[in-house]
Amino acid sequence: MAVGKNKGLSKGGKKGVKKKIVDPFTRKDWYDVKAPSMFTKRQVGTTLVNRTQGTKIASEGLKGRVFEVSLADLQADTDAERSFRKFRLIAEDVQGRNVLCNFHGMDLTTDKLRWMVKKWQTLVEANIDVKTTDGYLLRVFCIGFTNKDSLSQRKTCYAQHTQVRAIRKKMCEIITRDVTNSELREVVNKLIPDSIAKDIEKACHGIYPLRDVCIRKVKVLKRPRFEISKLMELHGEGGSGKRGEAGDKSERPEGYEPPVQESV
């Protein structure tokens, strides 16, 4: 019999004993995701994050998260015209258990884009970088399709190259006009009903009739320096109330002295 130490027994543990499995969800907390006040439904969902432990702060782990929500969910309706439009919201600050988000972009669903593309027509696309009055640099993509005239006997409705260039120029002009003179809040309010695309369709009717004109995508390329006051205003929680309601300054004559109390 060989004489020697048993390494397994010297460590005080038994062979084959598994470690106790800890559920990772016990170390996490739920936070409510809040959309800006431009949308009807403010509570859009919940998100998980590890609790604050040591130098790892929970709120810092939440900042910068991007949430993609359908416009139908944000507006709390079942309208099919809203369901294919997706808005991206980015977490900028945490107040208690609420994650305050800001607009981070917009896109269309893939099935909607595939449905719009058809044969015997011309697809016209345009994109331009524009800056809002409050310092957000946006890249806006627009798409449109030529429409067949009801009186035409042709099978196709192709536009000429000069007409395509004129339509693209008109798209860029209208997008620049509507975005550069507006703040981000006003731009989002225009994207919800897609009023910019409707203006483009009306303006281009004289060049060539269009159909299914829409703002296909919006990217936020650059944003101004973060300010908590502007974010709170975006969520409808800015300092709109009157100042000094709780402690107004009382008017007293000069040389006023408070009366001496007889007992305390």
UniProtKB/Swiss-Prot annotation:
GO BP: any one term: translation
Biased composition (Basic and acidic residues): 236-255
SMART domains, A to Z: Ribosomal_S3Ae
Predominant place of localization: cytoplasm
Keyword Ribonucleoprotein: yes
Keywords recorded for this protein, A-Z: Cytoplasm, Ribonucleoprotein, Ribosomal protein
Subunit note: Component of the small ribosomal subunit. Mature ribosomes consist of a small (40S) and a large (60S) subunit. The 40S subunit contains about 33 different proteins and 1 molecule of RNA (18S). The 60S subunit contains about 49 different proteins and 3 molecules of RNA (28S, 5.8S and 5S).
Protein name: Small ribosomal subunit protein eS1
Species of origin: Spodoptera frugiperda (Fall armyworm)
